[in-house]
């Protein structure tokens, strides 16, 4: 488990991070929830529950202790919020790609300079509180691909993910499984939505 950026008693903190093309972070988790807001580039987030693609202007929400790995395409500029899971009772409970609203984007930018300790009732506290409110209502986007349960399909998906630059033809993959392309399409649709 990675060390978190939150100081004791801190509800959230924001960190600006840039990643070069091709960078990867191996599987890890955090004690805090995490919102990764992508400003440029593309990020693929992999968890045991599936994969999420996060383009610019979007974010990915990761609940506390979610094991995840990251793969970066293009020069990625990101703003990452680390959020105390107890800061709000109704924070999202599952990994999801979300739309970063213009209000949330500006609040994230404003939160970059907020220290761990700040005056109660001041501007910094109001920004933090408003971010926490906005996290509860982020629009969810359908940019995930769950892993299939069927072991044959899961093996095919893992092979394709590991060799993403290869050109896979539906009929070729289907024949390796001993089924038709149409059957493969139906099974994949049934398993992954």
Where are these regions (language model features)?
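Ligand-binding loop in jelly-roll beta-barrel domains
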Residues: 65-95
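An amphipathic alpha-helical interaction segment
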Residues: 97-165
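Generic protein-terminus/edge-of-domain signal
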Residues: 1-43
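Short acidic-glycine-tyrosine-enriched beta hairpin
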Residues: 49-64
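A generic beta-sheet turn/junction motif
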Residues: 31, 47-49, 74-76
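ATP/adenylate-binding site constellation spanning eukaryotic-like Ser/Thr protein kinases
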Residues: 32, 40, 75, 105, ...
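Basic/polar phosphate-binding segments, predominantly the helix-turn-helix DNA-binding elements
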Residues: 161, 166-193
